Amino acid sequence: MSAQGQALQNHNNELVKCIEDLREKREEIIKQLREDDAEKAKITQELQILTKRLAQVNESIARKTETKNEYDKVISETEAAYLKILESSQTLLTVLKREAVNIAKKKQASS
């Protein structure tokens, strides 16, 4: 019986040791979970800050794009009007030269 008692005692000691090892491993996992949760909270906060900043940058881009488009429109309209002025001044110059020639011819004809 004493051999059986000794075996039972050895099994009991080994069982207690295994349970203690499992508890230590569990505590290590709990520690890692806390660290991961803290990192997750930090990342979540950073993500919220970055998301807000991204929204602000997108709004800025939209406003500046709208302003750029307005500049493009004004420049295009101004260039078109300027081209019309150039064409008109060229036409006016051509008419003026022709009239000057006609006046000179009339003057010579009457002399």
From Swiss-Prot:
Keywords: Cell cycle, Cell division, Cell projection, Cilium, Coiled coil, Cytoplasm, Cytoskeleton, Flagellum. It is found in: Cytoplasm, Cytoskeleton, Flagellum basal body; Cytoplasm, Cytoskeleton, Flagellum axoneme. Residues 6-71 form a coiled coil. The keyword tRNA processing does not apply. Its main location: cytoplasm. One of its GO terms (cellular component) is axoneme. One of its GO terms (biological process) is cell division. It comes from the Eukaryota. Disruption phenotype: RNAi-mediated knockdown results in multinucleate, multiflagellate cells. Microtubule-binding protein which stabilizes dynamic microtubules by slowing growth and shrinkage at both plus and minus ends and serves as a sensor of microtubule damage. Induces microtubule branching which is mediated by the formation of long SSNA1 fibrils which guide microtubule protofilaments to split apart from the mother microtubule and form daughter microtubules. Required for cell division. Self-assembles into fibrils in a head-to-tail fashion. Belongs to the SSNA1 family. This is Microtubule nucleation factor SSNA1. It comes from Chlamydomonas reinhardtii.
